[in-house]
Structures are given as structure tokens and as C-alpha cells.
Amino acid sequence: MSSIQRIAVIMAGGSGERFWPVSRRLHPKQLLRLTSPTDTMLHESVNRLKPLINPAHIYVQTSEELVPAIRAAGLGIPDENVIAEPCRRNTAGCLAYAAAHMLARYGGDGSSLSMAVVTADHRIGDNTAFAETVAKILEVVESEPVLGTIGIPPTRPSTGFGYIQAIIDDVPKDLGSVPQSFTVQAFREKPPLDVAKHYVANGDYFWNSGMFFWNIATFVREFDGADPTYGKAIRAMAEAMTRGDMPGVVKIFEGLTSISIDDALMEKAHKVAMVNATVAWDDIG
């Protein structure tokens, strides 16, 4: 594959209702210092990506009403890299919109663009180890036509996370310290406690981190197979953005089914690669 431009998209559209009244509609959790005494969660998210991706190519995708506050937050990225979704269409709509934006901005069919997707509400224990994990999965999706994700080795039988079942013949002894690539067998919904205990004991199940990685051309092609209306919409939105037809973009986006990226694409994709995280992680949602 020719020279690849790496792009990152931080999903930051949530309102953080769990943290009310500290987190409010126009000052949500991603703009609070919840996991660091000095940095907001968005600052932390951007800083984790900087070792791998130039800040000029780091984007934050959010709601229209949060754009001013995020642009004023001093994240060290260009103002135009704060992208507003026209309305809410769950994570599938969010990432379809992001892909269309990148196709319009960078041109081409996306084959020279790889995209890392993270969220602004994760607690990550070690930025260096995180960067090593992300670098590994980016290498995978840049070398073969697969979608990618990061799996978190479970530390307890949690009923609060979805799980990823990986194909592992023998669980490596260094699984907790060396990022390795595995093929995903299945995505599992949040389980009851007895099932979660089975997953943890089995050794080939990981928490679903909700982080995704792909070459954009591969992403669009996979949507062509999983949900052709989404593949068509991504291309149509990119074309409308290129010619400056934002009302047309909004009309297309509003017509999308509101569905998660797991349900719409990841569970139906031809092949998904997973790299195990080697860092402490939690979703504080």
C-alpha cells in the first residue's frame, strides 16, 4: 500500500448525565477534569494520540451545540477539526459522517487514509503502552483489508461491558504485556453475571473497548456489504460536502438508520482484527 495518512477521530458527543450536576448539557464530562487533576478528558484523549498522529489530523466529532466550547478548550488542534454532526444517528451514523468528511477533505477513495476512532470518556493508565497498542492495530489495518479494534483483557466478570471473542488456540503468557493481533470470532452483548464469569474463565474473551481502526476505503466497502444504504450515503455525503451542499448532506444524514457501529458493521464484516490492550482501561461513560 502506498503512503498512508493517519487520521484520528475522537467521539465526544455525549452529555455525561451520570455526572450531573458537575457535567451539564453545555459543559459535559469530556470538558471536565475527571481522570486528571490538570487535563480535561478531551485534552487527555488528544495527548494520547499525538505520538502517533499529527495534531493537524486529529479531529473531534460532537454535537452542534458543543462546538464553541470544544474549540475554546485549547486542545491544540485546528478549529475546523471540530466537526458537528447534523443530528444523532448513534455510532454508525457518527462514523459514516466522519468518513464522508475525510473523503471530502483529503480526496480520493480513502485507500490512502487510515482512521483511528477513540472516545473521550475512557480512563487509560499508561499513554506509552496505549500508543504501542494503537500502533500495532494501525499496522494491521494498513497492511490488509480488515477492520480493527482493541480488546481489553478482563480483570473481573463485568456485566457492564460488551465482549469480543477472539480466535486464540493457546492463550499467550505475555498477553498482558505485549500487544498481539488476533482474528475476531464474535461480538457479544453485555452478559448476565454467570455468562460473564464463563467469558473470563475461558481466556479468549475481551472487553469491547469501543475503539475502532480501519482504512477508510475498506470501511466503505465493508458497509457496501453489511448495509448498502450506509455505503451509498457515505459516498453521497462526501460528494455533497465537496461541492459545498450542506443542506444535501443533512438530508442524507437524517435519512440514516440510527444504529450502533457494532450492530451495523462490525458483527457483519468479512474479517475483524483485534489487538489486546496492555494498559489499564475503564469506560467512565
Model-predicted regions and their roles:
Residues R123-S158:
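Conserved donor-nucleotide/metal-binding helix-loop-beta segment in metal-dependent transferases, i.e.
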Residues V46, K50-I53, G74, M102, ...:
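Structural signal for hydrophobic packing residues in well-ordered secondary-structure cores
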Residues P68, T91-A92, R123-N127, R156-F161, ...:
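Short, well-ordered, mixed-charge alpha-helical segments that flank or form enzyme active sites
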Residues L31, V82, L147-T149, M274:
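Conserved beta-strand scaffold positions in the cores of enzyme catalytic domains, especially
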Residues M1-M11, E17-P28, T35-T119, R123-A131, ...:
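Conserved N-terminal catalytic core of the sugar/cofactor nucleotidyltransferase
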Residues M1-I4, M11, P51-I53, G107-S111, ...:
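Solvent-exposed alpha-helices and their adjacent loops that cap or buttress functional pockets
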Residues Y163-G285:
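Catalytic core of tubulin tyrosine ligase-like
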Residues I10-A12, Q61, A116-T119, T149-P153, ...:
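Short beta-strand segments
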